[in-house]
């Protein structure tokens, strides 16, 4: 049985645009990319991260001074894939605004928080969840020990990223992320993951004017 998310993504609408050279058709995501809008949807994994990073780099090459909008609806996923997106967001010249629509959980919440200061938003019914990384490994005791040390190092690094972008102390972040911690949009604003809850595009445009 096919994954329903894969099925939905395969049914991508096409839009038709009139140009000087006649009609041009785009899939909806390519058309939105022309407007410097990137969608980060579904589980964060290597293939998806590669596509998001490529779009960020392409838009930087097109115009290094113009803002990029990243729309997030993700349950999280692989830490290394998410950190590839995070590092690219910090690396490129354009400011990247983030907007949560639906949910931003786990790695999705970190990417939401990583947007440019005062340009991190969520819609009123969004759900944000933060927690520490998880993993499992089987093998020799010495290998398990090495993997345990690595995941603890990863935990410290992720905590430091949240500290940088939320303004919380390391101790506050570590305590909050100890277990799954769910927040609505207002709570996420209070905790520092986002800067504002948006109910209309006019509010977003006002913030960025």
From Swiss-Prot:
Give the matching CDD domains: S14_ClpP_2
Briefly, what is this protein's role?
Cleaves peptides in various proteins in a process that requires ATP hydrolysis. Has a chymotrypsin-like activity. Plays a major role in the degradation of misfolded proteins.
The major lineage groups are: Bacteria, Pseudomonadati, Pseudomonadota, Alphaproteobacteria, Hyphomicrobiales
Among the GO molecular function terms of this UniProt record, one is:
ATPase binding
InterPro entries registered for this protein in UniProt: ClpP, ClpP/crotonase-like_dom_sf, ClpP/TepA, ClpP_His_AS, ClpP_Ser_AS
Quaternary structure and interacting proteins, as annotated: Fourteen ClpP subunits assemble into 2 heptameric rings which stack back to back to give a disk-like structure with a central cavity, resembling the structure of eukaryotic proteasomes.
Family the UniProt entry places it in: Belongs to the peptidase S14 family.
Q: Where is the active site?
A: 106, 131
Which organism's genome codes for this protein?
A: Rhizobium etli (strain ATCC 51251 / DSM 11541 / JCM 21823 / NBRC 15573 / CFN 42)
Protein name, UniProt field = ATP-dependent Clp protease proteolytic subunit 2
Q: Which PROSITE patterns match?
A: CLP_PROTEASE_HIS (PS00382), CLP_PROTEASE_SER (PS00381)
